[in-house]
Amino acid sequence: MPTSAKALTKRLIEIPEMRRIQHLHFIGIGGSGMCGIAEVMNNQGYQVSGSDITESLVTKRLAQIGIDIAIGHDSKNIANADVIVVSSAIDRSNPEVKAALEARLPVVRRADMLGELMRYRHGIAIAGAHGKTTTTSLLTTMMAEGNLDPTYVIGGKLNASGKNAALGSSRFLIAEADESDASFLSLHPMAAIVTNIDQDHMETYGNSFDKLKAAYIQFLQNMPFYGLAVVCGDDPELYAMIDDIGRPVLTFGLEPFNDVQAVDLVTEGTKTHFTVLRRDHEPLRLTLNIPGVHNVYNALAAITMATDEGVDDAAITRALQKFEGVGRRFEQHASVEIDDGNVLLIDDYGHHPKEVDATIKAARQSFPERRLVMMFQPHRYSRTRDCFDDFVEVLSSVDELLLLDVYSAGESPIAGADTKALARSIRLRGAVEPTIVDKDNIAPVMQRLLKAGDMLITQGAGNVGQIAIDLAANNLYIK
């Protein structure tokens, strides 16, 4: 049988209802949520193409696996496509979207495409304000170690494989659920995790925390009545919502009332040792190779779900031993030599005050002897405005602070919510003297501030991570 015929047969067996669709085109394919779905569909035998405004490591990798990539948006890019998949950043003014609408092609959101993938599998969706990517990655690793071979779509790259998506051979699909634009309401999983809830992306919910909480309840009620909700019992807002979920619930946390509890936490460098207590199971002593109490919570969420899905303790133990973390989540790059010592480079994606605080605490815990120098890039003017006081408090706890301009993510500037305002308020607090840097003066500032024995953390969801890559590659900015 020809390869194309095999691919078609594979598609018809797995999703016969999608037999009319052969060619999918992704607009904004380089995005973290888009590239994973595109890769899964490509591996499933569909013809996949995509476009993005700029070339990146992601688009290069997708091209290497056979996906037709166009840089720039042009109506000709959608030729022969049967369906167009768009990220939340793409609107109807995009030339490819315009051409698709004129051709009466279906234009679907990324979450709707993920929802269709999930419809025909045992879907497990991971939602929450913080920790989604790490929790999804941990659960994927546990289920793979338990020989369940899941399909997965993750918002970051697994360091062990260098991938953020893969097509598995089993009925399981594990995926992140995005609350930022309420698109997680398009998913109908069999089981779901909510790591925590926080006031972020409030513009999506009319600046109403009650509407945000209602959306999470609706997300969990999208499961069948026999599904399972795994939620953090230590989060007071989540715990208060349990009675409204109307589905079976298991809680996890450090408090003794939880169904799954971690006790006896011991820190050893970047490792954390802890014991898991579960009903009807023997206590299980585990070692997590990534630092921070916040990651113990992420591990507990994954352990709770993995245990319910039948993963045994030996597989859970092996998974945690093998887990190498996720790209841009407290990712340690090679140290760079400076004077008579070195500077340790750490890169982290966290962009909310609670995430930044968790990074700082994990760094202090892991490397107490090193001075903490943070280069922070605020992400979105709206978040800077909404979390301004919390950012001031958290960022004041580092030893040296470098501030980049706000990464707008398409937003217009907001008065009093820019880097200068942030620096001014931090300076008035008096704990640390912030330095504003841009691409033209990074090198002299770094050369002046960094000392042997420091750790430099590049922090934020924008393009600040490239600085850590450049430093690790060639000591750029230091020498």
From Swiss-Prot:
E.C. number(s) listed in UniProt: 6.3.2.8
InterPro entries: Mur-like_cat_sf, Mur_ligase_C, Mur_ligase_C_dom_sf, Mur_ligase_cen, Mur_ligase_N, MurCDEF_pg_biosynth, UDP-N-AcMur_Ala_ligase_MurC
Class in the EC hierarchy, top level: ligase
Keywords per UniProt: ATP-binding, Cell cycle, Cell division, Cell shape, Cell wall biogenesis/degradation, Cytoplasm, Ligase, Nucleotide-binding, Peptidoglycan synthesis
A Pfam family reported for this protein in Swiss-Prot or TrEMBL: Mur_ligase
Reactions listed under catalytic activity: UDP-N-acetyl-alpha-D-muramate + L-alanine + ATP = UDP-N-acetyl-alpha-D-muramoyl-L-alanine + ADP + phosphate + H(+)
One cellular component (GO) term of this entry: cytoplasm
Subcellular location: Cytoplasm
Molecular function terms from GO: ATP binding; UDP-N-acetylmuramate-L-alanine ligase activity
Binding locations of ATP: G128, A129, H130, G131, K132, T133, T134
GO BP terms, alphabetized: cell division; cell wall organization; peptidoglycan biosynthetic process; regulation of cell shape
Role: Cell wall formation.
UniProt family annotation: Belongs to the MurCDEF family.
Protein name: UDP-N-acetylmuramate--L-alanine ligase
